[in-house]
């Protein structure tokens, strides 16, 4: 698993200037780019393929199929990246880890750029390989207000970030760490079953950004940034400061040690 889980957190840090060109930072960014592209291609592709097979996708069976595809795709994406970059595959997860002091701001910026580019490239590849099918994007269901959706996105992403912290970052995760990709992936799928009919269950700004840019659909787009960032940020702070004992997070009486270049 990621060495990030064994590193002390507890303090927001900008990072050192050399972090921007350090090979570990570049490798981690490439890992996030590829993992996010893998996830978005399979996730968005499952929706496009369902639309190809059936005229009406808004059925219980369709929701289950798309949720399962998202769950499995995220599990694989996290698994292939967790030992290199921490397997965030989500700007909101990166934000939660940043607030918890688990990576520097410089590295977080590289992660965000890589994740967004990965989502855009995956969506473009889907449009190219499907003969120009337009990605459906995300939208609010009838009767769902903007702030209802923000709260829903925050709640679902809070759970996702909490699960990530518990299975990937927590120093005492033990053997639970071996199921981290499945735990995070299955929770994403479960949240899609719960929230999909209301706002599409984004939980991942990169996942929403790719189809929005390629399909040029920006209505309510801010909802899928604000909600996940608030939820992930709260979960990261809660787990870092209330769940992880201070002795595990910061040795020598809580003294902070600067993040090493290999930290995620």
UniProtKB/Swiss-Prot annotation:
InterPro entries for the chain: Aquaporin-like, Aquaporin_transptr, MIP, MIP_CS
Distribution of this protein across tissues and organs: Expressed in leaves and at lower levels in roots.
GO cellular component: membrane; vacuolar membrane
Alphabetized CDD domains for the sequence: MIP
A GO MF term: water channel activity
Major place of residence: membrane
Keyword tags: Membrane, Repeat, Transmembrane, Transmembrane helix, Transport, Vacuole
Residue positions of motif NPA 2: 204-206
Subcellular location: Vacuole membrane
GO biological process, one term: water transport
Recorded topology in the membrane: Multi-pass membrane protein
Residue intervals passing through the bilayer: 28-48, 62-82, 105-125, 149-169, 176-196, 224-244
Key word Secreted present: no
Motif segment (NPA 1): 90-92
A Pfam family reported for this protein in Swiss-Prot or TrEMBL: MIP
SUPFAM superfamilies xrefs: Aquaporin-like
UniProt domain comment: Aquaporins contain two tandem repeats each containing three membrane-spanning domains and a pore-forming loop with the signature motif Asn-Pro-Ala (NPA).
Family in the record: Belongs to the MIP/aquaporin (TC 1.A.8) family. TIP (TC 1.A.8.10) subfamily.
Known function: Aquaporins facilitate the transport of water and small neutral solutes across cell membranes. May be involved in transport from the vacuolar compartment to the cytoplasm.
Protein name, entry field: Probable aquaporin TIP3-1
Source organism: Oryza sativa subsp. japonica (Rice)
């Amino acid at each position: 698993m990621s060495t990030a889980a064994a590193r002390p957190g507890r303090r927001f840090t900008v990072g050192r200037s050399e972090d921007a060109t350090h090979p570990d930072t570049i490798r981690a960014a490439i890992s996030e780019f590829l993992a996010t592209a893998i996830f978005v291609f399979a996730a968005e592709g499952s929706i496009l393929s369902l639309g190809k097979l059936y005229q009406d996708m808004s059925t219980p069976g369709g929701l289950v199929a798309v949720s399962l595809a998202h769950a499995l795709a995220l599990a694989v994406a996290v698994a292939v990246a967790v030992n290199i970059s921490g397997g965030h595959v989500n700007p909101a997860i990166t934000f939660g880890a940043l607030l918890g002091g688990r990576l520097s701001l410089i590295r977080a910026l590289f992660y965000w750029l890589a994740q967004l580019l990965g989502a855009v490239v995956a969506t473009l590849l889907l449009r190219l390989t499907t003969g120009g099918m337009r990605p459906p994007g995300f939208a609010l269901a009838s009767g769902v207000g903007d702030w209802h959706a923000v709260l829903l996105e925050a709640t679902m992403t809070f759970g996702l970030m909490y699960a990530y912290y518990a299975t990937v970052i927590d120093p005492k995760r033990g053997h639970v760490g071996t199921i981290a990709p499945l735990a995070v992936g299955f929770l994403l799928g479960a949240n899609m079953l719960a929230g999909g009919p209301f706002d599409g269950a984004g939980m991942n700004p990169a996942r929403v950004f790719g189809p929005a840019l390629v399909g040029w659909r920006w209505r309510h787009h801010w909802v899928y940034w604000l909600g996940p960032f608030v939820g992930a940020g709260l979960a990261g702070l809660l787990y870092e400061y209330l769940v992880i004992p201070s002795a595990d997070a910061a040795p020598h009486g809580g003294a902070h040690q600067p993040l090493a270049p290999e930290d995620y």
